[in-house]
Amino acid sequence: MASDLSKKRKFKDSKGSKPERALASSSKAKKLKRAPTPEDSDAERDNSSDPEIENQEPEVEVPGPPQDNSEDQEAEENANAFERQDEPAGLDSAIQKGDGSLLGPSVSTDAQAFSELNLSDKTMMSINEMGFTKMTEIQRRGIPPLLAGKDVLGAAKTGSGKTLAFLIPAIEMLNSLRFKPRNGTGVIVVTPTRELALQIFGVARELMKNHSQTYGVVIGGANIRAEEDKLGKGVNLLIATPGRLLDHLRRGSFVFKNLKSLIIDEADRILEVGFEDEMRHIVKILPKENRQTMLFSATQTTKVEDLARISLRPGPLYINVDEEKQFSTVEGLDQGYVIVDADKRFLLLFSFLKKMAKKKIIVFLSSCNSVKYYSELLQYIDLQVLDLHGKQKQQKRTNTFFEFCNAKQGTLICTDVAARGLDIPQVDWIVQFDPPDDPRDYIHRVGRTARGNNTKGRSLLFLQPCELGFLAHLKAAKVPVVEYDFPKNKILNVQSQLEKLIGSNYYLNQSAKDGYRSYLHAYASHSLRSVFDVQKLDMVKVAKGFGFSTPPRVDITLGAGMSRDKKPQARRAYGSQPRQSGHQRR
């Protein structure tokens, strides 16, 4: 609340950098319909807890929002996710001779600009059209060895520009080997979420607009038969989520014997959301001979090391651009927290959003039902917001994502489905209304702002007095936060009106109960239970934050039985999926 919140050093209501150029709008985006699967990175637990476990960092345009076409056009819309261009006149034999390295003069490891990389004219033309000249650190250190055909294990903060770091060498390889559609797939990019896959697809489209190779995306929620048809015609660069990729590999939907490059993006997140078995099967199925592998992960866990061991060739190059940094979050990010009682949390949030109405803000909550309730409540009282969570159908999620990307101001209420990798331009504020599950999630949430070089952003964390122990965990993770204070008389006290509204409006009352229940389930399943102990909550105050004068009856033992760092054992088999049947996700 810049002017209203005064920290022990003031909020600065800086204007930040100028808005990026308008995001491209594509008429070729898809209508996505399918029952939710574990590929919704915010996979949630039925009945027990509602928290989401949910997305690189391309600092470029992303494909525009899909058109809301009729059901009978679904296959055609999904087919348009693939771009096909004129075939090159190259020799098929070039595919078999390639060893993954690129021909031409060697590249200086001291290169600072893209023009120093000896890239093809077609790629350089695209990079120039996208407005890039100088490389980020991960690009400077990663692209030259990747162009030389080396395997790379990379670690970099969100917003570091690693999408270009892995796409440029992959596209150069396809170009140098003169891949044709009939040669099948030469590059596969695996990413944890549908939104991130669509975003990487948008970056690939920009980079490949002057090339003759084909490219496409396959994700859960899309029409699998339409995907099969396009894959059968030849997709040289394929972007996929793990479950859908394994589907197509097992179905024999496409030619992958000529695969030269496997890219695993956000490897730690892929494994966190339960795709360990799928990734092992994928790596086992794909050809290993002459295959270059690029594995990027924000954190180096034991599972990531195991995946690297089975997927990379011996002696990969390890690149960590963050190990010597003083802080775990990016420069230009002003981070603070406020201490607020549970019954004042919504009042403070409402006052903040009213004050910052002309800013672009993302508000993170811990559960889908809480997002649904608060977004409905805010819109009911004439504060327009967008909402994004894993209970929504894919079409709705995709439309909301692109609408917020293109907006110059506004508020997005969301779960952690939006916390990882997604590049949303010019976000001014990150508000963590519900604290994250651990410091890593905090870092990824605040990574939605201050993205790229010389950009500014601000974040605000809400903490109740009983949650102050979380600050020690942030300090241990090298996250610098300072306390923000706020004048009590500046908070809009609408509590009595809120309770009256919830008591008289049946629809909002039911939504509030669902949100309250899900909040407590999420809290009870928190991985840092020494800090976030549901038994220490003042239930009367928590209930007031949802608009109740007295707490509704809720059984919180379900959430307490499962920590969010544990994954459900039962998984639906991939392949034929049931039709969407409404509310299946919590």
UniProtKB/Swiss-Prot annotation:
| Xref: PROSITE patterns | DEAD_ATP_HELICASE, HELICASE_ATP_BIND_1, HELICASE_CTER, Q_MOTIF
| Class of the enzyme per the UniProt entry, highest EC level | hydrolase
Keywords, A to Z, come to: ATP-binding, Helicase, Hydrolase, Nucleotide-binding, Nucleus, Ribosome biogenesis, RNA-binding, rRNA processing
List positions binding ATP. Answer: 156-163
Motif DEAD box location, chain numbering: 265-268
Where the record annotates domain Helicase C-terminal, the positions are 332-502
Q: Which SMART domains does the record cross-reference, listed alphabetically? A: DEXDc (SM00487), DUF4217 (SM01178), HELICc (SM00490)
Q: Which intervals of the chain are annotated as region Disordered?
A: 1-107, 557-586
The entry sums up its family as follows: Belongs to the DEAD box helicase family. DDX18/HAS1 subfamily.
Q: What is this protein called?
A: ATP-dependent RNA helicase HAS1
Q: Which organism is it from?
A: Chaetomium globosum (strain ATCC 6205 / CBS 148.51 / DSM 1962 / NBRC 6347 / NRRL 1970) (Soil fungus)
